[in-house]
């Protein structure tokens, strides 16, 4: 899996995203010369299962207890990826997908 980045910027900020998890990787404040957000250090670290740092959470955000839920009287079972629970979309949530960039404009990146 290849980690690709995209950058948009204005006179104040430079924003870098990654295709893995449609992740927000860097929000760099130009005059203060500092990255304003937490990331995993290297974009290559996003290849491996990690915390959802900057990544798109989904299909839902948060934990589903015991990896199961009901709709009406029907019980559904999910894969467990956080002890006995399902976290942030399960084993292959949105944070693990390789997203295709469909538009890069001066002020937006769309995956």
What are the roles of these predicted feature ranges?
Residues 1-111:
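Surface-exposed acidic/polar loop and edge beta-strand patches at domain peripheries
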